[in-house]
């Protein structure tokens, strides 16, 4: 049986990390693509030379022509400009929208049957534009945000409670930005909801609010520390989890930026919600019950994403 083919569009820090993780997990043969000739070829060769040491069988090639992604089963898009200190994700809009137009055309021509995972920021607007530019089915184009945001939330909670990260489940809804909505009520330690843990004296509401805010600022905290770029290990691991769910038909319940067609009262937009990912792409959107405060926070997040999509249309009217 032929191996799966994974196309990584963008060979920066996330792209290289994606290639290494995909190789280690033997998800398939890997093509690193970048318009900067030499970088994908060099990274591909470097990672390939680690395969005898690490014991994985996968072909790794680098390319600067979209024809190399032909027939890919999964495309993971990181192409674009990363955040620098002082920039918001939204500051990247104009630059990265043009990149999405080129990437969308490449995928449309060479990999129209792929499951596409977008990581480029501002995430919710970029995945929406990428689906429009590529013309791929809406359930086959998703944004990586919720898995990463939930992972950050889970880590901070595990540190607060001094328990294993494996015993924490966490939910983050909404846009991938300052208005994201980490849901304490639906987050648990070994099945015990966070509000119950406050009553049990494990933490305080004030401490939990600080953790929620730190989760919202998770990307900016790393940008501020690195000073020359943005996070790449955790974003890459998060996207690989989504790709693996698709390739192995795992039916994983994963939060991601998915296309909504009426769920949560939202239409024709990509927003972070819990989904089931399997061989059909986004096979189901899970519509959880939100209380008044949660719904208001979610609606505020949706409004922020809608504003970004409107800004995209102003730049590229063809997106209407």
UniProtKB/Swiss-Prot annotation:
What Pfam families does the database record attribute to this sequence?
Ldh_1_C, Ldh_1_N
Binding of NAD(+), residues: 10-15, 34, 96, 119-121
Q: Where is the active site?
A: 176
What biological-process GO terms show up in the record?
lactate metabolic process; tricarboxylic acid cycle
Provide the residue positions that the database annotates as binding substrate: 83, 89, 121, 152
Quote one Gene Ontology molecular function term: L-malate dehydrogenase (NAD+) activity
Q: What is the top EC class of this enzyme, as a single word?
A: oxidoreductase
InterPro entries the record matches: L-lactate/malate_DH, Lactate/malate_DH_C, Lactate/malate_DH_N, Lactate_DH/Glyco_Ohase_4_C, Malate_DH_type3, NAD(P)-bd_dom_sf
Q: Does the keyword Cell cycle apply?
A: no
**Functional summary from the UniProt entry:** Catalyzes the reversible oxidation of malate to oxaloacetate.
Family, per entry: Belongs to the LDH/MDH superfamily. MDH type 3 family.
Q: What's the protein called, per UniProt?
A: Malate dehydrogenase
């Amino acid at each position: 049986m032929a191996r799966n083919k994974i196309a990584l569009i963008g060979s920066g820090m996330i792209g290289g990390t994606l290639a290494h993780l995909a190789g280690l997990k033997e998800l398939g043969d890997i093509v690193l693509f970048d318009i900067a000739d030499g970088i994908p070829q060099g990274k591909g060769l470097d990672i390939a030379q680690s395969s005898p040491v690490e014991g994985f069988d996968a072909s790794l090639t680098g390319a600067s022509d979209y024809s190399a992604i032909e027939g890919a089963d999964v495309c993971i898009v990181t192409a674009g400009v990363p955040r620098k200190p002082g920039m918001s994700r939204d500051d990247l809009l104009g630059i990265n929208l043009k990149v999405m137009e080129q990437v969308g055309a490449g995928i449309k021509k060479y990999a129209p049957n792929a499951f596409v995972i977008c990581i480029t920021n501002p995430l919710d607007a970029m995945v929406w534009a990428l689906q429009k530019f590529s013309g791929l089915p809406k359930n086959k184009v998703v944004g990586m945000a919720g898995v990463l945001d939930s992972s950050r939330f889970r880590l901070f909670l595990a540190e607060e409670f001094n328990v294993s990260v494996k015993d924490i489940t966490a939910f983050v809804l909404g846009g991938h930005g300052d208005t994201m909505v980490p849901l304490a009520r639906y987050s648990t330690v070994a099945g015990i909801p966070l509000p119950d843990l406050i009553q049990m004296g494990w933490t305080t509401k004030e401490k939990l609010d600080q953790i929620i805010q730190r989760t919202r600022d998770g990307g900016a905290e790393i940008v501020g520390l690195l000073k020359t770029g943005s996070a790449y290990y955790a974003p890459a691991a998060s996207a690989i989890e989504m790709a693996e769910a698709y390739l192995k038909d795992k039916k994983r319940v994963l939060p991601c930026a998915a296309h909504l067609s009426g769920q949560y009262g939202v239409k024709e937009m990509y927003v972070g919600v819990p989904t089931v990912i399997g061989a059909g792409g986004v096979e189901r959107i899970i519509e959880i019950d939100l209380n008044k405060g949660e719904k208001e926070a979610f609606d505020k997040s949706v409004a922020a994403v809608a504003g970004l999509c409107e800004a995209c249309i102003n730049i590229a009217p063809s997106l209407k």
